[in-house]
């Protein structure tokens, strides 16, 4: 039996389409014949429906997955206010515990062929007084896929984040160019520069380039991802 795959999705910033790309990957994995599940371990920003607290990002992931995990497993820490998680957690009296997330991930791996773990915000977002999302990725021991929001400043943001990933001893399994600014000048040149630098310095392949979409359509975006290349990279990144 083939061991399940898993990856940690991070971004160069917040609001650069991390959930959108994660959902697209879930659709892509399903088309690749894999049972695909999602974890959104920490979500900040909740709304109530039918007396149940929910999160829009988690809803999008559930809609894209062909294996839907129970909410308490998919998102063990659902915070109500849409703000920095360590601030909201302190206000709500919640301790964001990495061991709990690791246990949820371990259980998720028994239910799917591939588990997409979406982080919160960028690569180094504090979760408590001493740990951040980079520590979470390390605790999970997962290869990382970096979503780069293609807009002004994206080259520096991409290279800095890739360096931070390597400094934590993690493999950068690939990156996705997500065109968040349709009016950006020299978008092709920016993508080419990031592609060349990340390939040379990190051996990280470009596994997708997603055009600007209004409204966002993860199922359509899945066709813009090279899922076969991503699966190969994830397998190569296994310890």
From Swiss-Prot:
Chief localisation class: cytoplasm
HAMAP family found in the cross-reference section: BioD (MF_00336)
GO MF term list: ATP binding; dethiobiotin synthase activity; magnesium ion binding
Gene Ontology CC annotations of this record: cytosol
EC number: 6.3.3.3
Gene3D superfamilies: P-loop containing nucleotide triphosphate hydrolases
Binding-site positions, ATP: 15-20, 57, 118-121, 178-179
Binding-site list for Mg(2+): 19, 57, 118
Assembly and interaction partners: Homodimer.
Function text: Catalyzes a mechanistically unusual reaction, the ATP-dependent insertion of CO2 between the N7 and N8 nitrogen atoms of 7,8-diaminopelargonic acid (DAPA, also called 7,8-diammoniononanoate) to form a ureido ring.
Domain of life: Bacteria
Protein name: ATP-dependent dethiobiotin synthetase BioD
Active-site residues per Swiss-Prot or TrEMBL entry: 40
Pathway, per record: Cofactor biosynthesis; biotin biosynthesis; biotin from 7,8-diaminononanoate: step 1/2
Underlying gene: bioD
Source species of the chain: Burkholderia cenocepacia (strain ATCC BAA-245 / DSM 16553 / LMG 16656 / NCTC 13227 / J2315 / CF5610)
Catalytically driven reaction(s): (7R,8S)-7,8-diammoniononanoate + CO2 + ATP = (4R,5S)-dethiobiotin + ADP + phosphate + 3 H(+)
Cofactor: Mg(2+)
Transmembrane segments: none
InterPro entries from the UniProt entry: DTB_synth_BioD, P-loop_NTPase
Matches recorded under Pfam families: AAA_26
